[in-house]
Amino acid sequence: MGITSRLKVMSFLQYFIWGSWLVTLGSYMINTLDFTGANVGMVYSSKGLAAIIMPGIMGIIADKWLRAERAYMLCHLVCAGALLYATTVTDPQTMFWVMLVNAMAYMPTIALSNSVSYSCLAKAGQDPVTSFPPVRVFGTIGFIVAMWTVSLMGLELSSAQLYIASGASLLLALYALTLPKIPVAEKKANTTLVSKLGLDAFVLFKNPRMAIFFLFAMMLGAVLQITNVFGNPFLHDFARNPEFADSFVVKYPSILLSVSQMAEVGFILTIPFFLKRFGIKTVMLMSMLAWTLRFGFFAFGDPSPFGFVLLLLSMIVYGCAFDFFNISGSVFVEQEVDSSIRASAQGLFMTMVNGVGAWIGSLLSGMAVDYFSIDGVKDWQTIWLVFAAYALALAVIFALFFKYQHHPEKLSLSTKSLAH
């Protein structure tokens, strides 16, 4: 098997693990373990905490002691153990700590899998810019296949989803042993601990425009996890209505939600056109408005014929909502920041979105779900409208306060480096 095919298998398993539980664990905890919305939000906040803590620490470990593929293997072994133990947990506090251990091991593997891919492709004489995207798309395929597997097997409300994820983690840990050796990076002279942890980019907060950008990245990051956490439980709740109890939406909610991941692939292809034609600020605004539509369609969607169309539209606009901010935000950082701290700035952007923002969003969204619940019955329409109003308010404030001048010729140079 050629190196490209081997990396595709790695990418497939990397995201198959996540897809096995990320979208459905909330439903398992609410419906089977009887957790509250706040409990579920707390458990999912572990992902945000891990995204804040682990990348810098793992970077130091990989730099000093471990080759990338060995660090990758050890992380997935820890994931396998944590996910296996999670199948036995029935209280929210223990579940939080177990899933925090899992997240602290899993989150660094995303960057490590990219590093392994780039190194192997370069060693094989291939251009990572053109060769990596076809490898990475197998990750999205793996995520979707996992969602379909759990849904079609009727495991969305069962701890069996965690057994599947644990088994896939163990398989990937063993598979990592077969990957080519990645040499430890050469030590850079006079590299401070601050630089190793990526903290030197915090100087950017002295720039008002960058400070506003990172603040909005954090606030938008708060909405990214909401539908991962509560989208599946929302669809399962239609089972309370006898009219919808046997509907496709109730039986296979993850299959419906997987349309969101399919839409991501499609919208990624449109980003270069929209960035060059409209500029970064407009594309980021499109993302915020798409989040408003995502939640708004959820508020009025249901398994009826018209309601199903609204749910389907919600899945489609998710691709725009998710991709347009993440990609255009990364391009903005690439374009605006000095090359000496560009990598740290990209790390800070991801930390604000997937770390601080996701952590805050998971906790507050869980509280909001409980606030609009009476005797365990959730007022989903109000819940989604509140989230839609938040996204719309962000869009309006962003349009007013974020100043940006579109320069297509400058942008075209930046988008070329984005593939790295």
Model region roles, listed by residue range:
Residues M1, P180-L215, R240-A245, L418:
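Juxtamembrane intracellular "pre-TM" segments in multi-pass secondary transporters
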Residues R6, Y85-V89, S169-K181, G355, ...:
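Multi-pass alpha-helical transporter architecture, strongest
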Residues F12, A82, P92-L112, V116, ...:
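Hydrophobic core of transmembrane alpha-helices in multi-pass small-molecule transporters
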Residues D63-H76, K276-M288:
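Cytoplasmic membrane-interface "Motif A"-like loop-to-helix N-cap segments
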Residues L100-F138:
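Cytoplasmic helix-loop-helix junction between adjacent transmembrane helices
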Residues L152-A168, M367-A391:
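A membrane-interface helix-boundary motif in multi-pass transporters
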